[in-house]
Regions:
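Hydrophobic alpha-helical transmembrane segments
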Residues: 20-24, 30-48, 59, 68-78, 113-139, 199-200, ...
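N-terminal membrane topogenic signal
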Residues: 8-21
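N-terminal accessory targeting/assembly segments
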Residues: 2-5, 20-25, 31-32, 52
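Juxtamembrane helix-loop transition segments at the membrane interface in multi-pass membrane proteins
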Residues: 2-10, 40, 47, 55-76, ...
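Canonical hydrophobic alpha-helical transmembrane segment
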Residues: 53-55, 250
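Alpha-helical transmembrane segments of integral membrane proteins, especially early/N-terminal helices
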Residues: 9-12, 85, 89, 206-218
């Protein structure tokens, strides 16, 4: 009996989509296993493209429930960015002494082209982007999610009573009443999930600041203490790589935060 039950459960699991479990395993692998620069380039490019796709879907969604899986997408993209941060930090600290191309072309491009190769300008741009993301977009989206969840839950009994009244009056059929009840429940579940998922966006913004500071200090110690570099050399190389790493992570984070703000602020 136990063998038969295990076989049934395995067949049920095998029949479902395995995309999310595989993605989570890949994230764990990125945290534990050192990754080559070309793999980081592909993953960073995928992360930016994914954030743009999420933003486009959010913009064209007529109602929040049209993109009902957004809280799950928000969590997965946040975990992906954090895993990429850990993987890129390892590469920067281990191979940063070989030059600005040690962590891949994407990080090098953000460090060289976007900020003109000047790490002082890069620090200012990164700080401004983090402040806008953390103080304005993320905080506002989190507050809207919290208020929307509260009012949606408070309005549930009234909506259910209105549906029952329409059904008793013969204005709607049983199927229409069932559909409306499902929509009311889905709306409450969505805003409740967004209220919790918005905390991940806020935590991701804080983690981006901390990781950048740790990278700068770790890069300085690696260059000065282990490689015998001067302060200027260590700051020039590792800070440039760190700023490139920070920007390539904060840009998709900023885009996802905008998408979260758009979908929770949309009425209806």
């Amino acid at each position: 009996m136990a063998t038969e039950a295990a076989s049934i459960n395995f067949r049920g699991i095998n029949g479902r989509g395995m995309g999310a479990p595989i993605l989570l395993i890949m994230m764990l692998a990125m945290i534990v296993i050192p990754m080559p620069p070309i793999a980081l380039d592909m993953l960073f490019s995928f992360n930016i493209a994914l954030s743009l796709v999420v933003l486009m879907v959010t913009v064209y969604a007529l109602r929040p429930l049209d993109f009902g899986i957004f809280p799950t997408v928000l969590l997965i993209t946040t975990l992906l960015r954090l895993a990429l941060n850990v993987a890129s930090t390892r590469v920067v600290l281990l191979n940063g002494h070989t030059g600005t191309g040690a962590a891949g072309k994407v990080i090098e491009s953000f460090g060289e082209f976007v900020v003109g190769g000047n790490y002082a300008v890069g620090l200012v741009v990164f700080a401004i982007l983090v402040i806008i993301n953390f103080v304005v977009v993320t905080k506002g989206a989190g507050r809207v999610s919290e208020v929307s969840a509260r009012f949606t839950l408070d309005a549930m009994p009234g909506k259910q009573m209105a549906i029952d009244a329409d059904l008793n009056a013969g204005l709607i059929t049983q199927d229409e009443a069932r559909k409306r009840r499902e929509e009311v429940g889905q709306e409450a579940d969505f805003y409740g999930a967004m209220d919790g998922a918005s905390k991940f966006v806020r935590g991701d913004a804080i983690a981006g600041i901390v990781i950048t500071l740790v990278n700068i200090v770790g890069g300085f110690l690696t260059g000065a203490a282990l490689k015998g570099w001067t302060l200027t050399e260590s700051l020039s190389v590792f800070t440039r790589l760190t700023i490139g790493d920070g920007l390539v992570s904060q840009v998709p984070s900023f885009i996802i935060a905008i998408a979260a703000g758009l979908i929770v602020a949309r009425a209806g």
